Amino acid sequence: MISVCPQNDLQKCYRSLTFDVPGQQFEERNEQNLKKRAKKKGSFQPSVAFDTVPSTAGYSSIDDSREGFKGVPVPNYYTMEECYDDETDSFSPNLQYYLRDTFQSSPFLNTRKENKSESSSFPMRSSKLLEKNSDIKKYFLVSKNGKIVRRDYPSTPVIVNETLMINRFEKNWIKLWRQRKLQINERLNDKKKWFTYPELIFSEERIKPLYRGDDSAPCTKEQKRKHKILQQKVGYPNNPKTIVCHINGKKHTWVALDWTVYKFARNLDHIVVITTLPKMISNRKKTAKDDTEWAPGYQKEVIDQKLNDIFDYILQLVKVVKISVKITLEIIVGKIKKSLVDVINVHTPDFLVLATLKHERNENLITYKSKKLTDVFPVSYPIPTFVVPSKRMYSFELNLQREVNEHYVSKNHMKHEHTDVESMSSSMFKKNTISDISSHISVDSYAEDFKRQGYIKKQFNTSNDSIPRKLTGLAQHSRRKITGDIEKLQDDEKDRECTKEKLLLKKIDIIIRESLKSSLAIETLPGKNVSQSSHGDQISSFKNALIGNGSKNTKFRKSLIPYSSSEEQNTTTTIKLSSSPTSQIKFATSVKHKDGRAALGKARNLPDIRHSISFDKENSFDPSDKSSSVDNSIPLRKVKSAGALRKVKTNDSSSSAGSKKSSSSFSTVNTFTGGGVGIFKVFKSGSSSGNKSSSRRNSSSGDVFESDDRNDKKKKKKKKKKSLFLFGKI
């Protein structure tokens, strides 16, 4: 399969491709022979370049080539108003000519032509008129037959570069393109017949008329007409599909040209192939021998020869594909990016085809924020770009070589029936070997990856029982089985009566069943004679090869983790819990860790977190909760203020059922524990000695609080009334 390929290198097979084209006799490289060779191109004929015909004219010069250009009528005489008129918006025939690019004769000019006396006495010309006449001499040329021809296209060169080019088209291309244009025009005339929603596709836009200019002055007819022309949308020109392909001296770029001509191009397409040459600077002065130089350092004859060689190569491919296309070849002196930008501005292509050497399975063909040619154009330019990976196209290149050789072998066999038997046998042997290669190798093959990782050696002496071979064999067997079962399902008469949904379900069952069988076969892959250790090593190396971690110089390993066989053995991993993070809040040394939130001081506006957490406990109506709500074994902290003695509450004390303070304006209401707090204390009896003793059991300052309450009963009553008005702050 792979040993047939020269040097066992599929990735670089594009370098050694050869087309067995019948040889041509040697000719001297002069201009006459090059012209004769251009005429002998067979079905291709020369055509005009882009700088002689506007690209939006639809190749009208080809259509009207027999009729010829009729010339532009220019008036022989000027009126007095035209000579001394300084207003740019005045209505005159010459002004109409410059605005519309056409000349409209007026009736009073005919009277001027008849009167010879007035024509002889021409008035004095101003400086502006002299400049106008000098410009007219640049734009018009009087031919030999007396016709006045314009030579001001392009009026100002948009693109200035040193380029040699060839434009040729197939002999049937013009005929087919005319038919295509007629078909398009017919469909545009009868839109309702060919389009479902013509109102949406060809919507007519209304142009707002211009009545006044920027200076609020009324606009003239010429200004209104200009505004209407500029605001009207013309749309895209009716041109064929244009494909631009870039090649250079590197062989991998020619794979893009092969793919463009052989796979991508269709009838009536315009293929533009460009290549660039570096600009050379010569310090020496020009001599008589340098007259034939096209650019500094390049002879025109050599460039013409190279253009013809490239065209010959494309011609061999077109003959095999048998398509009618137009081909443009350009050799530009300058930088690649600037040359491509110029070509895009000139030809306005629909597609751009480039080649790259990137071929890894886990590698992106396009990289953002890169300065390479294949990365800049797909990202920065609004043109659909095809990037052809040359090293992955070995199957395509081998098939192309086989078909081109078969085409010319069959031609030679028809012309020369009495050829040698040995030459025919050798050609047939080459054909068979190449067909064997192309039939076994697919685009999704991993043969090049195995070779790069060392699985396929140059001698190709690996055993047939290797894991890569078994995997590929299992995959091919499962695919054949699935396709065969689906074909049988479609041919079965009983299944024809089933609905589409049932047929789809049966197909899904076939795919699932065969995929499960293949997965089970992969699990039992090594067999009886292979040891488990060697099998594990082979599997691990194979997995590393698939994800690109086998070689030393591999890149793009951002999201891929290398595989090792030891990972399967240690499936259970122990997770060490880290120590709890230390609190960043520091308290005094006398503060205990069980004091809760009260250790932070007064917190009137803060919500009570403990009530929200222990809601289920407080919701239970267990009588034991009322008596023993506080742990008596843990003594409470004694707090004494420096100024006036006042009560400081903790979380444990505030949540107890026995603590019922009448002067608490910030405590919450708990209806489930049975004790009234806050506002509801007003409606209860003021004497509750048992509760007082239970709440102050462990406090040494209880007597002080009792004496304070007896002496200030009036103040207490006032505070109770305030709690009613402070209900919104609770």
UniProtKB/Swiss-Prot annotation:
Record field: compositional bias (Basic residues): 713-723
Protein name: Uncharacterized protein YOR019W
Signal peptide extent: none
Bias type Basic and acidic residues, positions: 615-625
GO term, biological process aspect, one: autophagy of mitochondrion
Keyword Nucleotide-binding on entry: no
Alphabetical keyword list: Cell cycle
Residue intervals passing through the bilayer: none
Compositionally biased spans, kind Low complexity: 653-667, 684-701
